[in-house]
């Protein structure tokens, strides 16, 4: 098995219990949102699920960040919830199978992605850098939902880093 320098960076700077807590929080918030949406009229159910999922995930992940000393930014509306662990800024992103193209379009997400330029050099060093120095980076926890009320709507189909 090939050793991953990026995985080593993550293990070095992010505690395992933070990942476990994030995973539990994502599934719990998703289930809570699904249960809430089931009480709505059928015509509003998909919209209610999406809105409530967004709010529940933000609130629950914010609580996980607080409990794990990740200094989350202020919880407010559509703002991205960010936590910090070592060199990493950790954020959650969700998308439905039918909306993947819009995943990282916001200005703030573009700024967070730009922080990973030094991680690119770890993966593929250039002539002027060996890629050993990574001052800061962003770790996206990406939740992929089905986008359907009939196919696995109560939880993410996958959660990836």
Q: What role is predicted for each listed range?
A:
Residues 47, 65-91:
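A short acidic/basic microdomain associated with nuclease active sites
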Residues 3, 85-86, 103, 128:
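Solvent-exposed interaction surfaces and binding hotspots enriched for charged
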Residues 1-51:
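Interdomain/boundary linker segments immediately adjacent to catalytic/signaling cores
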């Amino acid at each position: 098995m090939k050793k991953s320098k990026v995985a080593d960076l993550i293990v070095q700077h992010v505690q395992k219990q933070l990942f476990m807590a994030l995973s539990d929080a994502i599934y719990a918030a998703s289930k809570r949102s699904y249960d809430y949406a089931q009480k709505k009229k059928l015509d509003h159910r998909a919209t209610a699920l999406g809105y409530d999922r967004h709010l529940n995930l933000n609130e629950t992940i914010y609580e996980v960040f607080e409990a794990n000393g990740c200094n989350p930014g202020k919880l407010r509306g559509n703002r991205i919830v960010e936590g910090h662990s070592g060199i990493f800024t950790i954020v959650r992103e969700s998308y439905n199978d039918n909306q993947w193209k819009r995943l990282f379009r916001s200005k703030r997400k573009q700024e967070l992605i730009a922080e990973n330029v030094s991680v690119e050099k770890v993966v593929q060093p250039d002539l002027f850098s060996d890629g050993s120095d990574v001052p800061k980076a962003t770790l996206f926890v990406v939740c992929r939902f089905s986008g359907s009320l009939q196919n696995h709507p109560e939880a993410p189909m996958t959660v990836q880093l």
